[in-house]
Swiss-Prot record:
Keyword Cell inner membrane set for record: no
A single BP term in Gene Ontology: tricarboxylic acid cycle
Protein name (record): Citrate synthase 4, mitochondrial
Lineage: Eukaryota, Viridiplantae, Streptophyta, Embryophyta, Tracheophyta
EC number per UniProt: 2.3.3.16
Molecular function per GO: ATP binding; citrate (Si)-synthase activity; zinc ion binding
Keywords: Mitochondrion, Transferase, Transit peptide, Tricarboxylic acid cycle
């Protein structure tokens, strides 16, 4: 296994990523050919849904009994790792290459998705269009969607009142999830279901709920931030700004580089196929025909767990603990000793390893590229770079880690901290805003395809022991 031990190794990594960006894959060219000039996203879906329904029906009728793999005891007791059991259209995670959004890698998305006029990072609205339609949108389509979201972003006062009923010291994710639950009062799906809407039309009020939810979560999230850290001095939405820039503005950061970072952050955190806790939770709750607000609030509660979205908070806190104990100019040898000290105390190195990935997370790579471009001399970024060289060999030597490489959480906190968003407890809320794009996109397709109530079979240890005994004697 090759480790990144020097600056030249980092340079090779950058060259590899830039090489990926310089040439479009066949999938990118195909999607570009499929793009339409229609500016209305919903009408695009109305055209796509019947053919995808027929495709799923054919798949089920012709191949419904085809086996996808074997289930082992390890899978059952190990969190269903590696068990294929979900249909998730918007993205697919490859252990070696990382995430692909509708077939596109992150470098490809950076190449083909529209950007802000003065920016270089993909607009989240463009990714949302891609996730929902499988097509690369035009600049005009993204502008139309951006305006639609801006017009949907009004949040009722009772949502703020619900948040204000909580102590200002409550965790940001508690306040955020409570705000999303309060938004549920306006659910179009719930009203339509109570009025007897036909199941073939379920996707339409789901679409309205999801677009409204995506539009409003940045407003709620920004309110939580300003309430907790800026004396409750909230900043109103600016309809002239794109999704990422407006979120940055409402948080109180109007620097163009912060807006660019927010566009990148939302895009790369938006979706990571369907098996992770937040995505799976959203799908699971939605399969009961709970409306998108209920489903997404449940997903946020899963995201708040230390083993999922809370990890980005823990990374920055751990990095700062390194600085406090060893100083910013820590040598690689000292850093190696600190890493071993952390591991020997029974803790993990936050931001390293992944349940599926077996290489460096491409979401880490693109954040590193952003840092090299905009903040190469930042002390914490330089420490993150040293960790990239030190940690993988240590974890490999430890011998208990399938993936010793950094994931997305290993970098995001340092970027946010550099621009003044230093409140690490809040970082998971940013993750939650981003994840609304992927979870809501899939919820729309769940209802459009008529996917069933999720109901896997569970077993007891007695059953497993009896089954294994029978299998061994056969």
């Amino acid at each position: 296994m090759v480790f990144f031990r020097s600056v030249s190794a980092f340079t090779r990594l950058r060259s590899r990523v830039q090489g990926q960006q310089s040439s479009l894959s066949n999938s990118v060219r195909w999607i570009q050919m499929q793009s339409s000039t229609d500016l209305d996203l919903k009408s695009q879906l109305q055209e796509l849904i019947p053919e995808q329904q027929d495709r799923l029906k054919k798949l089920k009728s012709e191949h419904g009994k085809v086996q996808l793999g074997n289930i082992t005891v390890d899978m059952v007791i190990g969190g269903m790792r590696g068990m294929t059991g979900l249909l998730w259209e918007t993205s697919l995670l490859d252990p070696e290459e990382g995430i692909r959004f509708r077939g596109l890698s992150i470098p490809e998305c950076q190449k083909v998705l529209p950007t802000a006029q003065s920016g270089a990072e993909p607009l989240p609205e463009g990714l949302l269009w891609l996730l929902l339609t499988g097509k690369v949108p035009s600049k005009e389509q993204v502008e139309a969607l951006s305006k639609d979201l801006a017009n949907r972003a009004a949040v009722p006062d009772y949502v703020y009142n619900a948040i204000d009923a909580l102590p200002s010291t409550a965790h940001p994710m508690t306040q955020f999830a409570s705000g999303v639950m309060a938004l549920q009062v306006q659910s179009e799906f719930q009203k339509a279901y109570e009025n007897g809407i036909h199941k073939s039309k379920f996707w339409e009020p789901t679409y309205e709920d999801c677009l409204n939810l995506i539009a409003r979560v940045p407003v709620v999230a920004a309110y939580v931030y300003r309430r907790m850290y800026k004396n409750g001095d909230s900043i109103p939405s600016d309809k002239s700004l794109d999704y990422g820039a407006n979120f940055s503005h409402m948080l109180g950061f109007d620097d163009e580089k912060v807006k660019e970072l927010m566009r990148l952050y939302i895009t790369i955190h938006s979706d990571h196929e369907g098996g992770n806790v937040s995505a799976h939770t959203g799908h699971l709750v939605g399969s009961a025909l709970s409306d998108p607000y209920l489903s997404f609030a449940a997903a946020l509660n899963g995201l708040a767990g230390p083993l999922h979205g809370l990890a980005n908070q823990e990374v920055l806190l751990w990095i700062k603990s390194v600085v406090e104990e060893c100083g910013e100019d820590i040598s690689k040898e000292q850093l190696k000793e600190y890493v071993w000290k952390t591991l020997n105390s029974g803790k993990v190195i936050p931001g390293y390893g992944h349940g599926v990935l077996r290489n460096t997370d491409p979401r880490y790579v693109c954040q590193r590229e952003f840092a090299l471009k905009h903040l190469p001399d930042d002390p914490l970024f330089q420490l993150v770079s040293k960790l990239y060289e030190v940690v993988p060999p240590v974890l490999t030597e430890l011998g208990k880690v399938k993936n010793p490489w950094p994931n997305v959480d290993a970098h995001s906190g340092v970027l946010l901290n550099h621009y003044g968003l230093t409140e690490a407890r809040y970082y998971t809320v940013l993750f939650g805003v981003s994840r609304s794009l992927g979870i809501c996109s899939q919820l729309i397709w769940d209802r459009a395809l008529g996917l069933a109530l999720e109901r896997p079979k569970s077993v007891t240890m007695d059953w497993l022991e009896a089954h294994c005994k029978k299998a061994s004697s056969a």
